[in-house]
Amino acid sequence: AEGAAWEGTLADTWIELTDESTMMGCVVEALDGHTVVGAESNYISSIDNLKAFDGGTMSGWMGTLNDWFTNFGFGEFTVAKGTLCAGDEIRIMYTRTVEDLGGSWNNSDTRLKALTFSTGKLAPKFSGDTFTYTLTVPEGTTSLLVTPTAANKNYQVRAYLGTQATGREYSRTSLIPIENGSVITVVCADDSWPTMNKTSDGKRTYTINVV
């Protein structure tokens, strides 16, 4: 943005987890060679001199874990607690309004904004208000990536092969094995999942039948 100390992407890398890994530790490791201020106190206030409040009273650094704005500091998400796992995706971004990154405390919308697949044609066309779909994939397809995006990223989204109750959960970076007749279930804002928001519009479940 105009007047910013810098813009663009500083790092896009994989980090090898250990039993001692934390979300914050992964961020610091990924930004090795850059100047990160505040990580030791569990709040990043500056990266390479791009500081909190440089872009206004609401501006600063925020982070998502699997495209979800976490409800605690990054240091609270750890391998030891089972809240940081192989395949998880961490993004640290600079915001001016919070809502410019897709999160909001001002609404309780638990629909999906988008739902994409690495292959195949979805029918009908995706809408956050449509909850059942057919995904037609090319013959011989044995796996695919599912990338859901919440309308409000303060709510978690998870994907399952099968149902939420009996299926297996897959991370957003993991290929889901499929065959003709497979069912993929994408859930947003289960009541038992953490969120910074005090209320929600209730759990939303999207069912995708693979053919």
Predicted stretch roles:
Residues 1-14:
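Eukaryote-biased recognition of intrinsically disordered, low-complexity regulatory segments
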Residues 11, 77-78, 172:
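Short, solvent-exposed loop/turn positions at domain surfaces
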Residues 87-90:
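Loop/turn positions that initiate beta-strands
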Residues 94-95:
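Short, surface-exposed secondary-structure boundary micro-motifs
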Residues 13-17, 122-125:
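Short, surface-exposed loop motifs enriched in S/T, G, D/E and P with embedded aromatic residues
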Residues 19-82:
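Hydrophobic, secondary-structure "cap" segments at the distal end of domains
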